Structures are given as C-alpha cells and as structure tokens.
A protein has these predicted regions:
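Assembly/oligomerization scaffold segments
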Residues: 1-125
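Compositionally biased, intrinsically disordered low-complexity segments enriched in polar/Pro/Gly
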Residues: 1-21, 215-224, 364-380
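Short beta-strand-centered interaction patches in the first periplasmic/extracellular domains
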Residues: 2-9, 115-124, 161-224, 230
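An acidic/polar, Gly/Ser/Thr-rich interaction patch typically located in mid-to-C-terminal regions
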Residues: 49-80, 221-380
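Amphipathic, non-transmembrane alpha-helical segments in extracytoplasmic/periplasmic proteins
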Residues: 63-66, 120, 132-158, 171-194, ...
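Solvent-exposed, acidic/flexible segments
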Residues: 78-80, 97, 135-143, 169-177, ...
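Conserved "cap/hinge" positions at secondary-structure junctions
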Residues: 89-91, 202, 316, 322
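Short, compositionally biased
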Residues: 101-110, 204-207, 331-342
Length: 380
C-alpha cells in the first residue's frame, strides 16, 4: 500500500464516532498499519471495522471494510504482502481492548457498490509450524509435550495445563499446530496461538472462573438459546487390552448432570473410547472424561447480541440471570465486536452453559401466600 506517511493504524475515531453512539457508550477504534497511524486518512472511506476472538481452533481476525469509489484501494493504496495491522476497539464506558499485531491475509473486492475488505489474522504461517512431523512421545506428561513443541516453535506457553501422565501418544505426520489441536480436544483443553504465545488451557479451569458480567434479558438486544433434550451422552465405555494379563479391560465413566437434581437428558447414547497402543488406564480415562464433559457442555448453548462491550472476549464466563431454566454461567466461545457507519457498536457472543444457576424465587407476599398459611394466620 503506497501512501506517504500512511500505513494502516489508527482507525475510526472520527466519522464512526460521530454517528455511532448509544445512550451509555461512544465507540472508538484505533488501527495501525505497519505501526503508522492513518485514522484521519482513511476516515472518509471507512464503512465498518470488526474484531472476532475465537476460543480455539481459529486465529483471531480483524476486518476493515472501505469504500472504493475512486479505485485508490485497488491501485496506489493496494496493501502489500506481509503488511501488519494492529487495532484498539472499545468505548468510553468499558474502556479499550488493545490487540496485538495481525498479518494481512486476504483482500476482497466487491461491486456494486465498490467496496474493499481487508482481513488480517493473529498468526502467520511460518515454516516451523508448516512442517509435518511423525514421532512418538513416551513416559511423559501432557504439559511436557506442550512445552517441548512450544520451544520448537519459539513460543511462550501460557494457561493452566492439567497433570495428565502420558504413557504414549503419537504424532502421525501432523503439523505441530494440528497435533496440539488434537491433544487439546482429546484431553479437555483449548489451544490457540496469540502473537508469540501458545495458549493451552484446561476447559474445567475456564469453567471455574467467576463471571465478568451478569446479564439480564433487558441487557440483550436479541438471543437464541437451545437445550438438547436427546443425543447428549451420559456415559462412556472405555475398552483396551491389558498386555501383561493378556485380557481385555473395560470400564465405565459417568458424567455429572448439568442441572443437579433435575431429570437427566433422555438419551441412550454411550460414547465408546478405545485405548490406543501403549496408553495407560489413567490416560484413556482422561480422554473419556474430556469427551463426556465436551458433550455435556454442548447441551445448552446459543448466541446473543448486545450493545458493544469489547472487554467481553472468548474464554471468559458471563452469567445469564432471569432466563428460567436457561439461567446460568456460560463460557464465551466466540466474541465478535463491530462498529459500523450508521449502525452503532454491537457485540455478538457465542456461548455454552458450564453451570446451571437457578433464578432466585420471588419473595412471598401476603397476596401470594399459600391458602393454608393464610387460613392459619386468620385463626391465630
């Protein structure tokens, strides 16, 4: 992108700020392109900016949508390969969320009307994490494997990793990122790379967090929540071969009910977990427990849209209150924050329930007391 003293940096604190306001919040965005502030330069062309934060499986993403009536974004301002974008997004009430540098990954042109969309991702594809590897890890732990791969990728490990002994696990000609993604899923963790950090976090540790916000129905613009009545496995059968005793071993693992005291989901489904060669019983049990927990936390899930709050990000817990049987603590799987010209500042969250928290029953009054109690009061 050839611009004198321009490289995409501080964005949107002008035109969108003046048009996209709310009763309690005034949105603000700052973008840097190759560490240079170009807010005032691109302000006349800016249609929207969005940031999507994923819990796992995908790189975080920034999209900048620009008018291109005169063709400058297709020609002299056309971005160059490897350019970096950084972003700050937020408002005057909740504060700003500062993101790290992201690498430009895609440029889209559509017409009519003539619009250019820039997409940037939080991680670039480097030679080290493209390499396919085949090897076995023996007599180690999950944490040790993660740290070993992080050193190979020159990344710093962050997050809480549960102590899970690993007798043997094999990397089957997989890229390191693919292998870590599989390990995380199999052993109840989430994984992604953010900048120079390798985030590997136990799912139960995420679920145990205190809610960062308590949301009532009136706090949400629209929502969709669903509860799977059937199809949620309640049990896992673990089978494997005991080489020493030369017998087949089989154990059963049960999940905890999402709503304690309530009727368990109607399901005859049972997960079947088969031990791989060299796996210990503790190792395969950990895989079974992770599979059950993942299935259970997928039972109640959904998404909702609310007035923008960039401080709500993937991996946090929010509590929904006043939603009846849907009330409870929810883990944020994905958060998308968007400021759009004429459309204001919105946050869209994808969530799953990690703990049911019943609503407090209304306090009894004289008008709502049971008839028996009312009669007793009359005779006293």
């Amino acid at each position: 992108m050839q611009m004198p003293n321009l490289h995409l940096g501080a964005l949107l604190s002008g035109s969108l700020n003046s048009t996209a306001s709310h009763l309690v919040t005034l949105p603000k965005v700052i973008i840097k392109y190759e560490q240079k502030d170009i807010t005032s330069d691109i302000q006349p062309y800016l249609l929207s900016v969005s940031y999507t934060d994923y819990l796992e499986g995908q790189s975080d993403e920034v999209q900048v949508e620009l008018e291109d009536v005169d063709g400058r974004w297709r020609q002299k301002w056309y971005p160059e390969q490897g350019d970096k974008i950084s972003l700050e997004i937020g408002d005057q009430i909740n504060g700003m969320l500062k993101l790290g540098s992201m690498e430009l990954a895609e440029i889209e042109y559509q017409h009519p009307p003539s619009v250019i969309t820039l997409k940037a991702l939080s991680t670039g594809i480097t030679k080290s994490n493209r390499t396919q590897r085949g090897r076995a890890y023996e007599h180690t732990t999950l944490a040790d494997i993660v740290r070993r791969i992080a050193r190979r990728l020159h990344l710093k490990v962050t997050g809480t990793i549960r102590h899970i002994p690993i007798e043997r696990v094999t990397q089957y000609q997989e890229r390191d990122v693919e292998f870590l993604t599989r390990l995380a899923k199999e052993y109840g963790h989430t994984f992604k790379i953010v900048g120079r950090q390798l985030v590997f976090q136990a799912n139960d540790a995420l679920a145990e967090q205190k809610p960062v916000a308590v949301l009532l129905p009136e706090d949400i613009k629209n929502f969709r929540l669903r509860d799977l009545i059937k199809g949620v496995p309640q049990e896992a059968v673990v089978s494997g071969y005991d080489a020493k005793r030369k017998t087949t071993r089989r154990t059963r693992r049960r999940s905890k009910a999402l709503r304690p005291g309530g009727k368990r989901a109607s399901s005859g489904d049972t997960l079947k977990i088969v031990a791989n060669r060299g796996e210990s019983q503790a190792q395969v049990n950990a895989r079974a427990d992770a599979a059950l927990a993942n299935a259970q936390q997928s039972q109640v899930a959904g998404n909702f849209s609310m007035v923008g709050n960039a401080k709500l990000v993937a991996g946090q817990v929010v509590q929904l209150k006043g939603f009846g049987k849907f009330s409870g603590k929810y883990l944020v799987k994905q958060a998308r924050h968007e400021i759009r010209r004429g459309g204001g500042f919105t946050s869209d969250l994808e969530v799953k329930m990690v703990e049911y928290v019943p609503d407090e029953p209304p306090q009894a009054t004289a008008a709502t007391q049971p008839k028996k109690q009312a009669a007793k009061n009359a005779n006293s």
